[in-house]
C-alpha cells in the first residue's frame, strides 16, 4: 500500500484498476481494515508492553501509514478506538495501573527533511495567526531511544513513577525507578512546585550496554538485542533488586501537570529542572530558523554514535509554553512538537548462507547469515528474508555482497545484492522440501499461500519449542524461569550415546501436554553445549593462554563435583515453583498459552469473560464464538479448528488433570448488574480510560462492544464522542453521560426504566 504524503492520500485501486472507495464499504473492505488495525495493535503491544518488537520501526511506520491512508480513503470505517487515535501501548498486567494527572502524548513522526520543513512552516503559519504570539523559537533536542517515564513529585518528594502506557494510564514502576541513581528522591533548590509531573526517557548508555551484554554472555545468558530493549526489560523487572543491578540512566525532557510554579518557555523549564537536581540532556539547543534546525539535524546525524546513548531522531518543539497551550493537541499528538526520524543506515556485508527457521505455527522462514558487521550502533550477523518469494524478489544469492539496512534502528533488513561484485561463485537459495526439524514434507497451509509450513504441528521439535516458549511468556503463564533456552532444552536436548551404542535423545516434552507433569527427576540427564574457558599451555610459545571450548553440561541440574553431587539448580527450582503458581492463572492466559491461531490477549479476554469456561468455549457454535466482542468469524474458525484436533484437546485435558484452572473465577464482590446488556463507550471520560471502562462492564457481566447497532442497549458518551453518538441517536439507543454510566454500573438497566425498555425496540424502518 502506498504511503500518504503531506498533500493527502493517493486514490486506491485494486489490481484491475477498480476503485476501492465505493459509497458503501463491502464486508471484505471492513475485514481488511480490521486486520490492518489488529496488525498495528499487535506490533504496538509487542514494542510498548512486552518489550519484544516483532517488526522493525520502519515496518511499523509503513504499517501505521497504511492504516492512516486507509482511514483517509474510507472515513466511514474509522473507529474511535483505532490505533491512529491512541497513544503508545496497552498497560501490562505485571504492574498496577496508575492514571497520569495529565495525558502523555505521542509525537507526530516525519521521515524526510522535506516533510519536516513542511511541518515547521505549517506550525509557523499557525502561530502567526495567534493574536499576540511571539516569534517562533524552536527547542531542538535528540530523541533518545529508551522508555518513556512519568515522575510525580509532591512538595519536592518523588511519590510515583509510571510508564507511558496508553497515554492516560501507565504501569506503576515506582520501586524500580527508585533504584536509578540519577533520579533524585527529593528535589533540591528553591521555589519547588506543590505538585509536578516530570517526563523523560530511561535508557542505558552505549558503553554500559556493551558491558552489560558481555556480562550476560559470560553468565551463559542471551544478550539483549539493543539498548532500548535492555532498558525497558530492566525497568519492568518484578524484582527491584534486578533493576538496581542494571546500569539505567534518565534524561528528563518535559513537564506534564504542574501546580505552584509558572514556566514561560520549554528551555527555561529545562534550566529549572536542572536546578532541582534532575538530569537534563546536554544535547538540546534553542534555534531561530528552519535552516538552523536542519543544521542541527545534520550535526547530530554525523555524530549520533559518538553520543552518550543511542538516538533515533531529533525532536523539535515550539519553545514558548503559552504558544504550546494555544496550539493544543490532537487526540494523539501535540500540534507544537514533531519527531524527525533519521533515515535507516546501510552497510555492505557478505551473505554467507541462507538458512530456515520453523516457527510456532509451522511457518518456515528463511533468514540470511552474514559476516558480522556493525550498523546503527550494534553488530548484526542475521536478518530475516520472510519467505521464498521475498528471496527471489530481492534477487540475492548465497555468497553475494549485500546491502544491509538497520531499518528504524531496530531490526536489520537485507535490501539487495551488489551485483557488480559478483564473481560467479554465488548460488541460488532453494527452499527445503522437508522440515529441517522433523523431516515432514513442507507445503502451503492452503492454495495460494506465500508461506510454506510444516504440517506436523504436534511433534515437530521446532514448533513445540516455540509453543512452550510462548506458553511461558509474559502474556500467557508468565513463567520467567522458562525462557527460550530452557524451552529448547525441554524439547530438543543434545542426543547422548548409551553404552550399547544407541542414542538417548528422547526429550522430556514430546508435546506441551506434559508441561505441568514434569518433575525435577525427569530433567536430570538433559544436557546442553556451553562454552567453557580453560587455561592451557600454547604449544608454540609455552605460555599460559585462555581458550574457549564447547563443553557438554547438565542444563536443569548442577554440574557434579567430587565434593558435591548434582542437584536441581536454583533456576530449575524457580521454574517448578512458577509452574505450580501458573495452574491458578486466569482463563484468558490459558487460552493464549494454547497457541490458538489468531487468539491474542484481546480475543482471549473476551472469550473468557463471555463464555467463562474452557468447556463452554470448546462446545460453542461458530455463531456464538463470532458474536463475542473482539472475536469475529476468522478467530471463531481458528478456535473450532483447534478443538477439532484430538491431540490439541489432549493438551487441554492433561493440563486440567494436572490442576490448571479452566474456568473464569467469579468475583462475588462485584454485582452482576449488566448480565445480557450491551454497552458501547465512546469519547473521553474523566474517571475511566477506554480499557478500565470496558473492564468495569465485563466484570458486571455485560458486553463491551466497539460499535453501535440495534442490539446496543446503552451508549456512554464522553467528550468528542463522534459518529457513534449520531448513530445511537438515529437508532434510539439510550445515551448516558459519565454520571449515568456509574449509575448503570451500580444499579443496572432497571435504573433507567422506560429508556432501557426502548433500547430493546426495533428502530423505525427496521
From Swiss-Prot:
UniProt KW keywords: DNA damage, DNA repair, DNA replication, Ligase, Magnesium, Manganese, Metal-binding, NAD, Zinc
Entry-linked CDD domains: BRCT_DNA_ligase_like, LIGANc
Sequence positions that bind Zn(2+): 435, 438, 454, 460
Assigned EC number: 6.5.1.2
Catalytic activity: NAD(+) + (deoxyribonucleotide)n-3'-hydroxyl + 5'-phospho-(deoxyribonucleotide)m = (deoxyribonucleotide)n+m + AMP + beta-nicotinamide D-nucleotide
Residues where NAD(+) binds: 57-61, 106-107, 141, 164, 201, 317, 341
MF terms (GO), sorted A to Z: DNA ligase (NAD+) activity; metal ion binding
GO process annotations (BP): DNA repair; DNA replication
GO CC list: cytosol
Needed cofactors: Mg(2+); Mn(2+)
Active site per UniProt: 143 (n6-amp-lysine intermediate)
UniProt domain BRCT: residue ranges: 669-758
Enzyme class per UniProt: ligase
Region (Disordered): 1-30, 747-766
Functional description taken from the UniProt entry: DNA ligase that catalyzes the formation of phosphodiester linkages between 5'-phosphoryl and 3'-hydroxyl groups in double-stranded DNA using NAD as a coenzyme and as the energy source for the reaction. It is essential for DNA replication and repair of damaged DNA.
Protein family: Belongs to the NAD-dependent DNA ligase family. LigA subfamily.
Name the record gives this protein: DNA ligase
